Amino acid sequence: MLFRSAESSKADNSGTDGKVYNIGICQLVQHEALDAATKGFKDYLTEKLGADNVKFDEQNAQGDSATCATICNQFVSSNYDLILGNGTAALQAAYTATPNIPILGTSITDYGTALDKSDWNGVSGMNVSGTTDLAPLDQQAAMLKELFPDAKNVGILYCSAEANSKYQSDTITPYFKDAGYTVKSYSFADSNDVAAVAKTACDESDVLYIPTDNTAASNTGIIDNVATAAKTPIVAGEEGICKGCGVATLSISYDELGRKTGEMAYNILVKGEDITKMKVEAAPNVTKEYIKDRCDTYGIKVPDGYTEIKAE
């Protein structure tokens, strides 16, 4: 089933010469981080274009890759001016659907993995660019060590269907090992086996790390129940997962990330920048965040420099 809305917006329309820009937004799944990125993207373009000069066709694939393909093919048939792929599968579907329409990704961890480009250097040379939501993995590993200096076993929990999640697991593992931890990855295929895999991971680990992962983000309630029962704390790769089941995260602002993506779209549509030469951008700021109640429950001593956020 397709979940779809179309809307127009009014604001400052300087520089548009009255042109109406039609933008298709394919969002992989509904959850806090991706929702914020979509909102930031739309807000930026609304502010810059406005006055009925931009129309968004926003559709949510509800976590289904095949639906992403259907949505993006519809965008291509409509000959939209630009497509936003929010989430890895959404970007991949857009990339497969058209070599011509400019495509921007957001909430993407690693574009080389997403686009299957082994020689990725930050510029696609094609009709694809965008923003990455990856907070520096070495800093994430260092933060976990800061909070759990006496832990021995770190488990990494992620969805095997998400290529970017495996990339994060593979990339952060050496940093954990360098910090003196024994590391094991635990992957679940989809939402149906989250609970079983999470239980095994909790039983065999002193602390879990969950990277930015859309399926995990949509199942934090299940993961939290398992981890709480097992008394296994979780460090998360992004704020939404942390609020749902974690104790701490090194987080970016997904609204800020979406606005950065919107700025790139504006530069393509209005300023005529060549997307084939545009570098993938990252969020400008990262923040150490923690959930006080959960940290207190586990007896975690949180050093200075962390910002408190509330659990959901």
Predicted regions and their residues:
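Pocket-lining segment of extracytoplasmic ligand-binding domains
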Residues: A163-T232, E238
